[in-house]
Amino acid sequence: MVTNKDSRGKGKRKMEEGESSGRWKGAVYKRRKQAYKVVPVKPPALCVFRYNWLNSDRTNIVVGNTPRVDLITCFAQGKADNNRHTNQTVLYKFNIQGTCYMSDASAPFIGPVRLYHWLVYDAEPKQAMPDATDIFTMPWNLLPSTWTVQRAWSHRFVVKRKWTVNLVTDGRKVGSKTVDQRYNWVVGKNIVDANKFFKGLRVTTEWMNTGDGKIGDIKKGALYLISSTRGGVTGDSASTAFDVVCAYTHACYFKAIGIQ
């Protein structure tokens, strides 16, 4: 039992246990719920990785009848805007643009030439670059239009995009004034611009804790660019390799997610 002054401040009275004695004595009220502030989560920034498609000696790439395989997801580890800074990246968009023209060795031939490109996803890179023969079934080696992913490896390789670039040789080199009068009726298109922009790729790559961005750094999920030209099939062109020089520049738009 406790004692307290009454409301008039005269004397003291007895109070029972549990009885309140404040301003809100006898009032029934509800406890106010605490309001939580919603803090928006900032999504990871979109990184842009740009590079020129060149050989190790800084010369332009020459694509022939023998298909070549190049790694697109080659993001080095670092803190810059074009680096990966986590153990996982998602490639959303890919841009390739530049100019294609006939090589000097193939320019003397007359006829159409087609250049093929594929974007191929590899779910299990095995820390080594595959050959085109490991990916495609090739009924005709010189005709890329007949190539399809091998049935035994369909769970590993997926063709994300495929496109072609068309050229026409008129018997003379690019920029040459010399004309073969036998074929002066041929409308040449031996140099063309090639631009492609792909969205919605969503290629997820898991990385090891190494920094150079090569195929050996990838645990899962790599993206390749495979290129080849269509070869000759009859006559003098049956054993001819049509070579196309590609002066390309690439841009990869990706996000770095996951843990550091």
Swiss-Prot record:
Keywords: Capsid protein, DNA-binding, Host nucleus, T=1 icosahedral capsid protein, Viral penetration into host nucleus, Virion, Virus entry into host cell. GO terms for biological process: symbiont entry into host cell; viral penetration into host nucleus. Transmembrane segments: none annotated. Residues 1-23 are annotated as: Disordered. The keyword DNA-binding applies. A motif (Bipartite nuclear localization signal) lies at residues 10-36. GO terms for cellular component: host cell; host cell nucleus; T=1 icosahedral viral capsid. Coiled coil: none annotated. Residues 1-22 have a biased composition (Basic and acidic residues). InterPro entries: Gemcoat_MSV, GV_A/BR1_coat, Viral_coat. Its main location: virion. The keyword DNA-binding applies. GO terms for molecular function: DNA binding; structural molecule activity. It is found in: Virion; Host nucleus. Encapsidates the viral genome into characteristic twinned ('geminate') particles. Binds the genomic viral ssDNA and shuttles it into and out of the cell nucleus. Plays a role in protection of the genome from degradation, virus acquisition and transmission by insect vectors, infectivity, and systemic movement. The CP of monopartite geminiviruses is absolutely essential for virus movement. Belongs to the geminiviridae capsid protein family. Homomultimer. Interacts with the movement protein. Binds to single-stranded and double-stranded viral DNA. This is Capsid protein. It comes from Wheat dwarf virus (isolate Sweden).
